[in-house]
A protein has these predicted regions:
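C-terminal non-catalytic accessory extensions
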Residues: 246-287
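N-terminal secretory signal peptides that target proteins for export/translocation
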Residues: 1-6
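Flexible, surface-exposed loop/linker segments and immediately adjacent secondary-structure boundaries
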Residues: 24-173, 178-262
Length: 287
């Protein structure tokens, strides 16, 4: 009986794992300005030719013009200034596929430059689902903005009850202010277009072939502080759940640990790592 049950469960388990296995590492092909990548306890300087695995956090500065990520299927994500994004976020598989990015804040331009459709991205207020074409997305504290530069895309407005979905058409712009329901206009205003990062305004070709068979040794960057990661650590539960394992080495730093302890109520999944004695069963009394 047990073997029969296991044989029935195995295909389901494989299906759940498939989206994570199928999404290849992203390749950095353009770096115009400073950027860093946080891969577990490692902090790296982002450089052209660097491969970024699942759940790697990329951070650009206010002075960064563009960081381009390419996947083998010809899909791309360009990151603009003052942006934080997670590559291939494994905790956010939806509809049998994982998004290319979780955009915590800042600017991203997504495009499908090959035959494959783009898997989209997730931001705090919107889920941009799989599409063909090119989209510009901005995620801010009080505003979310999606412009269908070429083609269209299905959008899901997150954290609304009842759930709200819409189909963004070519040329349209979607704007959502804070947690209110968003609106769609037939085209962006000149003021909106002026906000688009200048690095997004030119059509850039795929460059992955230039890095074929080239090994890039990543330079180490300064280890992230609690303040650097705070917005991630107190973010969505699906993203936070693996962080105690992924960032365990960082908790050995006194200042980082102090930040975790101070804000433990915002990320309680860290408690077993910080205070393992609270989860140890008391020894049985002698008889």
């Amino acid at each position: 009986m047990y073997l029969v049950s296991l044989s029935r469960l195995l295909p389901l388990l494989l299906a759940l794992l498939l989206p994570l296995q199928a999404r290849a590492a992203a390749l950095v092909t353009i770096v115009d300005g400073a950027a860093s990548a946080i891969d577990g306890s490692r902090a790296l300087v982002v450089a052209e030719g660097l491969k970024l695995g699942n759940d790697t956090i990329v951070r650009t500065t206010a002075a960064t013009t563009l960081v381009r990520l390419e996947w083998p299927d010809g899909t791309v994500a360009d990151l603009g200034p003052d942006t934080q994004a997670m590559v291939n976020p494994g905790g956010l598989v939806r509809g049998g596929s994982a998004p290319a990015l979780y955009l915590l804040r800042g600017w991203a331009k997504l495009a499908s430059l090959g035959s494959a459709g783009h898997p989209g991205l997730v931001a705090p207020r919107v889920d941009v689902q799989a599409f063909k074409g090119a989209l510009v997305v901005m995620a801010g504290a009080d505003e979310t903005w999606v412009f269908a530069e070429a083609g269209g895309a299905p959008l899901l407005e997150r954290d609304l009850r009842p759930a709200s979905s819409l189909a963004l058409k070519n040329g349209e712009v979607y704007v959502r202010l804070a947690a209110a329901k968003g609106s769609v206009a037939p085209r962006p205003t000149p003021a909106q277009m002026q906000r688009v990062p200048r690095g997004f305004r030119d059509a850039l070709p795929l460059r992955a072939a230039a890095f074929k068979d080239k090994a890039v040794t990543a330079k180490t960057a300064a280890a992230p502080t609690y303040a650097d990661l705070r917005d991630w650590l107190v973010g969505e539960t699906a993203l936070r759940r693996p962080f105690p394992r992924r960032f365990a080495a960082l908790a050995r730093d006194g200042a980082f640990r102090a930040g975790l302890v101070e804000h433990l109520a915002r990320h309680p999944e860290w408690e077993p790592l910080l205070f393992p004695e609270r989860f140890t069963k008391p020894a049985a009394a002698p008889r």
